[in-house]
Every structure is written in structure tokens, then in C-alpha cells.
Amino acid sequence: MNRKKISLVFVFFLAFFLVGCTQKASDPKVDNWDKYQKQGSITIGFDNTFVPMGFEEKNGQYAGFDIDLAQEVSEKLGIHVHFQPIDWDMKETELQNGTIDAIWNGYSATDERREKVAFTIPYMQNQQVLVSKKSQNIQSVSDMKDKVLGAQAGSSGYLDFEGQPELLKNIVKDQKANQYQSFNEALIDLQNDRIDALLIDRVYANYYLQTEGILEQYEIFPAGFESESFAVGVRPADQTLLANLNKAFVELYQEGKFQEISQKWFGEDVATEQIKGEEN
């Protein structure tokens, strides 16, 4: 057999092997818990630029509050967690297609999203803020009149921006926000004065600017929207996974592990009343 034929045979068997090793997509219409237990894993979709919730470090490793929390939860569930970076703007589509089994990365539980996704109990609160350079002299929403705004496509902040135009959209330049695929891209444009302010999660803004040592160069102020709850999103049919996630959250708090992770990333206990078991 000549080299060309050998190469073709090798490529064929390699492709066959790789396909066989690929995790089969989950059926979006059924409870997949038995499947997860049999294969020993679930796939979590996340935005690998969302510091400090879940992000990729320079060495290629994943880190963040949600990454640590998911790993602790996976031990409770007795299954492995596979982290899959996704286009955040396509997260619900990825979930419904069965290519991921959960959305877990600072994912805000909004009424609009509840139409497609089943949420766990919320595990922490967040607020949408505006970040601007102090040199721009923008310190409140009213200062945003005719200013250029940036936001991440598909983010809860952008959904608020579009859904409640009277609070911010109607006053910014052209009544629109420049959309970015990642927060990092938006921050680069903010730093280079291509946008005047960035609509962003408070947890990201505080952590990133503090870590970079540039917090004193920026103004951070409320965007005017209600605070939001972070939760894990699964397919509505996956009720067993949903119940097990909720149980694991509460148990981790009772054991003090949730607080350890929270202190590591935020320097405080960010757990919701539901996680603490104090909800009326």
C-alpha cells in the first residue's frame, strides 16, 4: 500500500475514533440525569472572559468563583464537570441544542430567560453599573446624554438596556449601545476613548479594575436597573439535575465551603438568603 493510501486510511480511522470519543449531545426534551450519571459528567457553557466568575488564565487553565463553585458541586453530585467556552450571545441556543447541559457563569435569572430556561435558586446578587474614565467627567446616568455607550452582546445589562429604554437607552448617543462579544474587547475601547462608558456587571468591574491597579482612574456608578440574581440555567426537562444543584448549594453553605470560595474571590460572603436557608 503506497503512502497516500496509508495516509487516507489513517485519517479515516482517526476521524472515526475522535467521533466515537465525542460526548453525545443531550436530548433537550427529557430528564437526562441517568445519562449524566452513566457518562460521569455534564458540560457547562461559560464565557471564558468573565472575570472573576469564570475565565481562562494565561496558562490556559480556567479559574473564577463559578469555576471553583461548580467543581465543589460536581463532587457533591458524583460527576465530572466539563467546562465549554461558548459565544455568550448564543448560550440559550447551545443549551436547547443539547451541546451544553448548563449555563453557569454569572448568568442572571431574568423573566425573559425563564421562558426558555429553568433556573436554580439564586446564589448571589449583582448590579449593572456604568464604568467611565474619570477624565470624561461622567458620574451619573444623567451625564450620559449623547454619550457613546458599550455593552456585551446578549448580556443581562444589554437586555435591561433594550427592555427599559426610559432609564438609559433614550439618552445615549443614537439611542443604541455598541455591542461587543467579550468584556475585554469593550474595555479596550473604553480605555482608548472609542466609547464613553461601559454597561457592565459590578462584580466584573470591581475585580478587573482592582486587579489591574487602575481602579482609581475610573468612575463606577449604578446604571439605574434593579439588582439581579445569578443562578445556574438548565433545560426545563432536567428537573433532577436542577434539584441536585439546589441541594448541593445549600449543603456547601452549611459546610462552610461556599463561604471559603466567596472570601477567596470577593473578600466577603456573597450568598443569597436562599443559599443560607434563611428565606421566609
Feature-to-residue mapping (PLM):
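Extended ligand-binding regions for polar small-molecule ligands
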Residues: 22, 67-76, 142-148, 153-155, ...
